[in-house]
Structures are given as C-alpha cells and as structure tokens.
Amino acid sequence: MKLLFFDMEFANGKIPGSVFSLGYVVTDEDFNILSGPTDICINPDCEWNSYVADKILAYPMETIESSPLFPACYEEICALFADADIAVGFSVGNDVTALKKACERYKLSPIPYFWFDMERVCKRANKNRGAHGLAGCVTAWCGEAPENQHRSDGDALATMHLMRAICRDAHIDAEMLITAYPECAGDTIAPQNQQKKPKNVHRGGKNGSKRRHHRPRKKTPAQEKATAEGKA
C-alpha cells in the first residue's frame, strides 16, 4: 500500500481554489518514506487575505508569485494522486474541496482519489481526545510539537507522524487503521458516499483480519499520460 500524506495552504478563503502550496510525503504502509517531504508552490493568481500573507505564508511572497499557475502543476498533482492507494490528511475536507475548486476554476478534470481524515480518527480514538488541531494532536500522540507549522510539506509530514504514532500505539499498520475507521474515509468520485464504508473490504487477511482491495479508479487524461510515461 502506498500512502500520500498531503496538505494545502490557501491565499484567500473567499476565493475557492486559491491554493498556493501543496505539500506531500509518500510512504508505504509501514511509514517508510518513499518520497518527500516536498512542497509544490503555486501562484494563486488572486488577492491575498491579509492575515494569511502576514501570519501564515511560510515563503517569501516573491517565491509564490513567481511560481507557476495551477494548470502548469496539474499533471504533477494528478500523477501523485494516481500513484497512491490513498491520500491522508488532517481536517481533509478543506483540502478536498480546495483541490476540486481549483480544477473547476481552470476548467480541468476533477482528480479522483480515495481519502482518509486523521482529525476524525483522533476524535474517535480512546486516547488524547482533549487534543485539538494538528499541532495539538501531534503533540499529544508523538510527545513533541510538529516542526514547520503552516508550511504544507511540514503539515503533511506531521500528519504522517500522527498516523504512525496511532498505529504503533495500537500495534497495527496503516491499512488496518483505515479499515477500522471507514467513517473517516471517502472518495472524490462519489461525494454522496464519502461517509459510508468503502465497498472493497472483505475478510481475507491473516487470522481473518480485514484487508482492503482498492477498486480501479477512473483516471484523468493527465494521469493516464503519467502512467504511460512511467512504463516507458
């Protein structure tokens, strides 16, 4: 299983799809890092919220404004999601919506992927229920505050550390955690089913444990191109 931990930052919450960075870390189900942490910087092409510009932005403004627009990053982003079995975030609904809106803004095909929300897991876990926010949950579960807060690659890495800590505490791997919390998962293909248990799970693992078989996902043209290039 390949996991894509991701996080996004937005220039202006009133402008749908105003993404200025997408950070990610790719791991296997035992949390061995395969790629990243990396930030994809994007010119949001909009008026900035003053608070974001002054307090949240982790890069020089010149770096972001000289970065390519979202369409130029689209194929790279599509390839990331196509190559992963699941995308994991914290309070992932905001990121899912922003990525969808960014595609709509530039009239690009939506990116299909299966997601898992660690914030929802933390609210349902038996321990550390008093922790709030990514920093609070990481501190509670990992014993130290995350680094590079509000920088999307830093938050993606912190999300990975959080999931790893919860799995180690329960002596399970990532796939088992995802199977245990189907209500914390969803996909961007059928939004109406995002709160329902994924269909492709059955008991076929060792000792009758649940194992997930991911259903084929319809790929965008950009994803098909990325797959073809990878086989060349």
How would you name each of these model-derived features?
Residues 116-132:
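Short alpha-helix plus adjacent loop in nuclease-associated cores
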Residues 2-101, 106, 112, 139-144:
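Conserved non-catalytic scaffold segment of RNase H-like nuclease domains
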Residues 160-232:
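Acidic two-metal-ion nuclease catalytic site recognized across multiple nuclease folds
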Residues 52, 99-101, 125-127, 204-213:
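Short, conserved acidic/polar surface loops in the N-terminal third of protein domains
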Residues 86-93, 97-103, 133-192:
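Acidic, Mg2+-coordinating catalytic module of metal-dependent nucleases/exonucleases
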Residues 74, 131-134:
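Alpha-helix initiation and N-capping motif
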Residues 110-114, 170:
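P-loop/Walker A phosphate-binding loop and immediately adjacent motor/lid segment at beta-alpha junctions
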Residues 114-117, 178-179:
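Beta-strand segments within the central parallel beta-sheet cores of soluble alpha/beta enzyme folds
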